[in-house]
């Protein structure tokens, strides 16, 4: 076997036909360059594809060797710079005019440049002095560009889109917009759709700002739970009433609404009952009864209400010997009733002070009462007190109000007999002090409206002593059962003689 030394492809002479082919293939592989794109035999070589491209100057950065041309606005925007003297047809370029002159068999001449002539570029500046492109260093490169710039920035927008009402100063811009108007939609993250890109960009800026502000406020609320509670519970008094950590009688009174719901919440906490389920109709009936002169309805319905004699708004000097005086039905009486109704609602806000102070001593919450039960109890108490035909407790004199204003809150339970005896004591003192002098007239009060009060009977025909009727202490035993009451005495013989016709 003959071997070819140094040849890795050498084989035996029996395969001599293939040796020549393999040698020739190996020689060709060394001469043909590597066609693998991943391999780079010369890593220092740089691709010249980008350098072969001619870079275009950015707008506003002209060639410093270019000729700067300044045109007036009239010349710049003129549509017919070159006019034919035969047909008055205008052309924007002189070359077009020369070709047109050839049609009239006129001499024409086209500009021809010699090979030695150096072609210099021309740049155009904006005719507006305040424009940034008025400077030669910011000149625009061609005549068409300076015309469009002047029209867009300083010209009138003559073309208007019928779909979106957007106006354009350049007709080509208007045509390009008309092709795509309404075909594309820009959707914001908040779900709003826009057909115009500029409107979408403006909205997106505000929307992102609002989103960031909302995220910042939510982070502050999460870091400070007090702020979040304050922001989320405006006017929510149910949370305050149902909060077991707050003391009894605590009311959030940051905002007072004049509607009936605010009155229900105030009366509910003032009485010490849970009157959240009270119907508005029942409360309106109570307010209406109070406005017609039934002023003893509220003090007698619950002991948690403040004593009206202790508030100086209701201090009316009572020097008349006729204890059956009531508010008249005139316009003055209506104004007084309205003011008393408003003051009743206003003073009910002070009731938690009395209820909380008394409940510190007695931790016995009152049972809830419905509106119907409350009205029935008020009517029962009013009918019991109507036997005395006297004024309400807040018509007491200055001596009585001064003592009650500094006294402790009224007791929890007040029977009709105790109230009746207090009123009789007051009437006795009035009769004793003002027996020999005439009563001065009381403004806004008359005796002709006795029938207007459903809780009082008509006793206008009786004198003050006879109107006391059977409520006098004939036996003089009141001090035995009630030693804390003073000023009670039995009847004198001459006083008993006045009641003889009643028997």
UniProtKB/Swiss-Prot annotation:
It holds the Pfam family C2CH-3rd_BIRD-IDD. Residues 196-208 are annotated as: SHR-binding. A zinc finger (CCHC-type) spans 186-209. One of its GO terms (cellular component) is nucleus. The modification Phosphoserine is found at residue 72. A zinc finger (C2H2-type) spans 82-104, 124-154, 159-182. Its main location: nucleus. A motif (Nuclear localization signal 2) lies at residues 146-153. The keyword Nucleus applies. Residues 32-68, 301-417, 432-465 are annotated as: Disordered. It is found in: Nucleus. Zn(2+) 1 binds at residues 161, 164, 177, 181. Keywords: Activator, DNA-binding, Metal-binding, Nucleus, Phosphoprotein, Repeat, Transcription, Transcription regulation, Zinc, Zinc-finger. Induction: Not regulated by SCR and SHR. InterPro entries: C2CH-3rd_BIRD-IDD, C2CH-4th_BIRD-IDD, C2H2-2nd_BIRD-IDD, IDD1-16, Znf_C2H2_sf, Znf_C2H2_type. Residues 381-392, 444-465 have a biased composition (Polar residues). The keyword Amino-acid biosynthesis does not apply. Transmembrane segments: none annotated. Expressed in the quiescent center, the ground tissue stem cells and to a lesser extent in mature cortex and endodermis cells. Zn(2+) 2 binds at residues 188, 190, 203, 207. A motif (Nuclear localization signal 1) lies at residues 100-107. Early initiation of expression in ground tissue is SHR- and SCR-independent but later maintenance becomes dependent on both. Interacts with SHR, SCR, MGP and itself. The heterodimer with SHR involves its zinc fingers. Interacts with SIEL. Binds to RGA and SCL3 competitively in the nucleus. This is Zinc finger protein JACKDAW. The gene is JKD.
